[in-house]
Amino acid sequence: MGKLLQLALHPVEMKAALKLKFCRTPLFSIYDQSTSPYLLHCFELLNLTSRSFAAVIRELHPELRNCVTLFYLILRALDTIEDDMSIEHDLKIDLLRHFHEKLLLTKWSFDGNAPDVKDRAVLTDFESILIEFHKLKPEYQEVIKEITEKMGNGMADYILDENYNLNGLQTVHDYDVYCHYVAGLVGDGLTRLIVIAKFANESLYSNEQLYESMGLFLQKTNIIRDYNEDLVDGRSFWPKEIWSQYAPQLKDFMKPENEQLGLDCINHLVLNALSHVIDVLTYLAGIHEQSTFQFCAIPQVMAIATLALVFNNREVLHGNVKIRKGTTCYLILKSRTLRGCVEIFDYYLRDIKSKLAVQDPNFLKLNIQISKIEQFMEEMYQDKLPPNVKPNETPIFLKVKERSRYDDELVPTQQEEEYKFNMVLSIILSVLLGFYYIYTLHRA
């Protein structure tokens, strides 16, 4: 009932939710004659582990869909081992360091997780994953094995790092390195898969900073949002170099008297996350295939919406905050084009600026960072130039010009969805008016 009320109070979001549910046709389907029962089981596991992420993966082009599904499940298996405190220490380290070697086997599974571990099915049913993994092209297998090895060793290193376990992340550099192992490596692997599939220019992988920023922007947003939940669970990922400028201890921000200091710290962390936005937009401009673009764009627009939500928001210090379901539907539909993504970023950057107080210690730095992003977005399209002034053909302008051809191909689809929605709405309103007319006749 609460979600329905939310939608009713936000008609644009209600329209987006209805269009997403009833008018949009997925680009691709997972169900065809060649889908094996093992692969279908992998899709079931994917749905069990992450409903939202599963929905985006299922609509990927068939060339990428299966390998991205397996890549996600394999990394989820690693996460499940790392997070389970019931696994004996030495066994856990051994499993993490050598997990990539399990991918060479045709049969292997693990049932050593505690019974209440959420995603243990990924490990108990790992043989289904292995069967499908060995059907992938060798170049896809190689990428997944390499990233699995790097991530597994990174996880093991953090478990063995006594300073990290006692004191958490110390410097901003430590923060970036941690986010690299958790999310940057995923961006590395996915970018290589996309380039191998020829769904983006090869230059996309030549600039490490671009795909690194794709992962770091998402991870840093989640870390800021999850402050309260992580502290309750006995974890902390905010870097001391930043939070120690505002309080002696990280948990001090929960105290009412330190709330404003906590907000200043949140805003400082948002400033740090915003440093990745230009790279994110540059990366998105380099993707050609539509389903791959949507797969990459949706998490990024959700991240900027979440950053705007957590900015200067005291609720972050005391509980969980989430963007509305209706907002999610709206963002999914609008982010299907690069221009739509740019408009989303522009909207939420203005939202952040509107909540920025002059008293904020980072007032000037935040304004400068947001202005840099806004100038970059203007450079991407240059469609506000005076008459007879030619655009400056910068690398990003030319890249966006090429991407715009693919955006234009989506226009008929969007128009058809709008037509379907308007037709259905007209029919519903006509029926309701008809019933109302009959009702008034009987009353008379």
Curated annotation (Swiss-Prot):
The keyword Ribonucleoprotein does not apply. It is a single-pass membrane protein. Its EC number is 2.5.1.21. It holds the Pfam family SQS_PSY. Keywords: Endoplasmic reticulum, Isoprene biosynthesis, Lipid biosynthesis, Lipid metabolism, Magnesium, Membrane, Microsome, Multifunctional enzyme, NADP, Steroid biosynthesis, Steroid metabolism, Sterol biosynthesis, Sterol metabolism, Transferase, Transmembrane, Transmembrane helix. The chain crosses the membrane at residues 421-441. Disruption phenotype: Impairs the production of ergosterol and leads to a 6-fold increase in the synthesis of polyprenols. One of its GO terms (cellular component) is membrane. SUPFAM superfamilies: Terpenoid synthases. PROSITE patterns: SQUALEN_PHYTOEN_SYN_1, SQUALEN_PHYTOEN_SYN_2. It comes from the Eukaryota. One of its GO terms (molecular function) is squalene synthase [NAD(P)H] activity. CDD domains: Trans_IPPS_HH. Present with 10800 molecules/cell in log phase SD medium. Squalene synthase; part of the third module of ergosterol biosynthesis pathway that includes the late steps of the pathway. ERG9 produces squalene from 2 farnesyl pyrophosphate moieties. The third module or late pathway involves the ergosterol synthesis itself through consecutive reactions that mainly occur in the endoplasmic reticulum (ER) membrane. Firstly, the squalene synthase ERG9 catalyzes the condensation of 2 farnesyl pyrophosphate moieties to form squalene, which is the precursor of all steroids. This is Squalene synthase ERG9. It comes from Saccharomyces cerevisiae (strain ATCC 204508 / S288c) (Baker's yeast). The gene is ERG9.
